[in-house]
A protein has these predicted regions:
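Collagenous Gly-X-Y triple-helix signature in extracellular proteins
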Residues: 1-189
Length: 189
């Protein structure tokens, strides 16, 4: 028999993070999914309070990089306005594109899937369990789909993006659908 022991410590006194570490951000929690040589990558355990669409029109032209959703959550203004991120603002590291927050990729959640735009990411270890891919907006609400970064590649799919379904499988949704947003962010050591 194994014992899972949790020990609470302040984020200010932590020199490093491990996969599975959980932090509280206001009303949300976030779990460490990966550790690099300079940062820990966290994924919110819940969807943001508000559901968002990917784009105002049914198009995936430009991908996530040119989407309305990215422009809403990726910039420093969103983090500055959202009090839930107050505790970590000083430790956030921008991603390569300059964003402080982004949504996860198909690769990070499910591993490589040729049906979707390739992203070069490996599946996060914790995402190998379906229960870690499923989430809700508020405790007790029904599960819903949540956006992923990738465009659908095949057929006449000019308006579809990948999503995590309510049961933890991959699915695709049109860009104007309203869906859950589960931000990813990096914290410096």
């Amino acid at each position: 028999m194994n014992i899972l022991r949790r020990q609470e410590t302040s984020i200010e006194s932590t020199a490093d993070f491990q996969i599975g570490d959980q932090i509280r951000l206001g009303k949300y929690t976030a779990t460490c999914q990966a550790v690099t040589n300079k940062a820990a990558i966290f994924l919110l355990d819940q969807y943001l309070d508000k559901a968002y669409r990917m784009n105002p029109t049914d198009t995936n032209r430009g991908g996530y990089a040119r989407s309305e959703l990215r422009h809403r959550i990726g910039n420093a203004g969103f983090v500055a306005k959202d009090d839930n991120f107050r505790a970590v603002r000083g430790r956030l590291i921008p991603f390569q594109n300059g964003d402080l927050l982004r949504i996860p990729t198909v690769g990070e959640i499910f591993g490589d899937d040729p049906f979707y735009e390739r992203d070069g990411h490996k599946q996060w270890e914790l995402m190998k369990k379906r229960c870690n891919r499923i989430t809700e907006r508020d405790e007790g609400e029904e599960y819903e789909h949540g956006w992923l970064w990738n465009k659908v590649q095949h057929g006449d799919a000019k308006s579809f993006f990948a999503a995590v379904s309510y049961n933890g499988d991959t699915e695709c949704e049109t860009a104007t659908e309203i869906g859950g947003v589960r931000p990813v962010f990096q914290l410096a050591f």
